[in-house]
């Protein structure tokens, strides 16, 4: 519908960006209690300096999962938007305790591969299952195959269980608006959900 005479205002992006600026500028995360706390604060400072883009995506798409990982002796936090994270289960407090992280497609020869990483927290046991899928067409999950079909996934275990865990090892964040599209769902919606046609 857009042409030389009719141009979109771009309000959805502007709204998401404005909310992200407010959230990230007022965000404070701190730990105290010695050398370990100092290390945590150092890692969190790096995360906070880059978090605005992630929050902007969260506001636009309706959700974001944050998952920490270790690399080179430092802790990094992977931000996964609603396009690549599927919440599967919520506890009585509406906290996401199970979900699936979908990797970016990897092309090997003429085939595309994606890795689905299932995370589940049940009764103090945290389970991670890794599965690989392949398709000849990009964007299609396809059929399940062995993880080893992709060289960089070959060393990843198919399943890991961690016991005596108090909470999920990821966080699921949604915009502070009610889901007016599916009122029975715990999933988040865009900050401008329900008004998309009026805003474009």
Protein language model features and the residues they cover:
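Extended, helix-rich architectural segments
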Residues: 1-91, 95-96, 107
């Amino acid at each position: 519908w857009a042409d030389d005479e009719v141009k979109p205002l771009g309000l959805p992006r502007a709204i998401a960006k404005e909310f992200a600026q407010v959230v990230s500028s007022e965000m404070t995360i701190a730990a105290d209690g010695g050398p370990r706390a100092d290390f945590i604060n150092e890692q969190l400072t790096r995360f906070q300096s880059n978090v605005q883009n992630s929050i902007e995506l969260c506001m636009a798409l309706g959700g974001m999962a944050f998952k920490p990982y270790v690399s080179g002796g430092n802790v990094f936090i992977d931000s996964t938007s609603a396009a690549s994270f599927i919440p599967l289960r919520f506890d009585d407090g509406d906290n996401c305790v199970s979900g699936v992280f979908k990797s970016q497609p990897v092309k090997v020869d003429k085939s595309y591969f994606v890795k689905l990483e299932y995370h589940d927290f049940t009764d103090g046991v945290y389970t991670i299952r890794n599965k690989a899928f392949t398709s000849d067409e990009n964007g299609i999950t396809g059929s399940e195959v062995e993880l080893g079909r992709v060289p960089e996934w070959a060393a990843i275990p198919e399943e890991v269980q961690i016991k005596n865990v108090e909470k999920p090892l990821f966080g699921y964040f949604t915009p502070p608006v009610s889901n007016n599209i599916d009122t029975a769902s715990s999933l988040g919606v865009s900050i401008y959900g329900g008004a998309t046609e009026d805003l474009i």
